[in-house]
């Protein structure tokens, strides 16, 4: 059947529109998953500091010896090599994202420290100086409480709780949101269980600007905390996602076992797309 010459331009416009829409979606989204880390996965990961990758053991963020005994004064991070679009300057829109991961903490002492954090930072983020210990590899202690000195948002799982020693920690083990400075904006009590896997879901809703964390152990014990935050106030337009962990004089190992992440930038309103003299 012949196609009318009047219909062809409309088909061309529709095709171009779909291609542009698909491109916009691909530029504004990121998705990856590691249910179990396998050989070759490290090609898409950036390891920093003392972090090591093993196909059989996952990612060990802080230093351990050949017997698995954790070291003192150690810090390590892992980031995904692909950048994520956090918001769009031209339209001022935000991204939705969801991260799922599991980790295990082990310590030969009762008061092991310091903790692990899921974080989002600028693409060129490196481990700050002197950040082993309580700042969890996220900031230099001298600028830890200076919002303008850091561009990072983190969900921390902090096992250190001697408040009088650093001035920012609550006096209990906790899950907390670190919005730029290291002091948590919102926290909930959390129990570190030596050698047990903690499964975590972190989600961000761009419409409500709500960041929520749900964590649980295999026996069903769960924890939840949420906080409203506008990513545009703290983070650049593009960033990287990853994990950071550290120990000071009190020590423990921090093993990342699985990690998946998805993000989608909310679609730009159709009137922003112009095709020739047509406004879609």
Swiss-Prot record:
PANTHER family noted in UniProt: CONCANAVALIN A-LIKE LECTIN FAMILY PROTEIN (PTHR32401), LEGUME LECTIN DOMAIN-CONTAINING PROTEIN (PTHR32401:SF47)
Describe the protein's quaternary organization and the partners it interacts with: Homodimer.
Q: Which UniProt keywords apply?
A: Calcium, Hemagglutinin, Lectin, Manganese, Mannose-binding, Metal-binding, Signal
Remarks, miscellaneous: The hemagglutination activity of native and recombinant SL-I was not inhibited by cellobiose even at 120 mM, however alpha-methylmannoside and 2-alpha-mannose inhibited hemagglutination at 0.38 mM and 0.39 mM respectively.
Task: Cite the post-translational modification comment.
Answer: Glycosylated.
The positions annotated for binding Mn(2+) are 156, 158, 169, 174
Q: Which GO terms describe its molecular function?
A: cytokinin binding; D-mannose binding; metal ion binding
Instruction: Say what the protein does.
Output: Alpha-methyl-D-mannoside-specific lectin. Has hemagglutinating activity towards rabbit erythrocytes. Binds to cytokinins and significantly inhibits physiological effects of cytokinin activity such as cotyledon expansion and delayed leaf senescence.
In terms of PROSITE patterns, this protein maps to: LECTIN_LEGUME_BETA
**Family (UniProt):** Belongs to the leguminous lectin family.
Q: What is the lineage of its organism?
A: Eukaryota, Viridiplantae, Streptophyta, Embryophyta, Tracheophyta
Query: Which GO terms fall under biological process for this protein?
Result: cell-cell adhesion; negative regulation of cytokinin-activated signaling pathway
* Record has tRNA processing as a keyword: no
Q: Which InterPro entries match?
A: ConA-like_dom_sf (IPR013320), L-lectin (IPR016363), Lectin_legB_Mn/Ca_BS (IPR019825), Legume_lectin_dom (IPR001220), Leguminous_Lectin (IPR050258)
The stretch of residues making up the signal peptide is 1-26
Looking up CDD domains in the UniProt record yields:
lectin_legume_LecRK_Arcelin_ConA
SS bond list: none
Report if keyword Nucleus is assigned. Answer: no
- For this entry, the protein name equals Alpha-methyl-mannoside-specific lectin
Residues holding a carbohydrate: 114, 134, 165-166, 248, 250
Annotated residues that bind Ca(2+) are located at 158, 160, 166, 169
Which SUPFAM superfamilies does the UniProt entry name for this protein? Concanavalin A-like lectins/glucanases
Provide the coiled-coil residue spans.
Answer: none
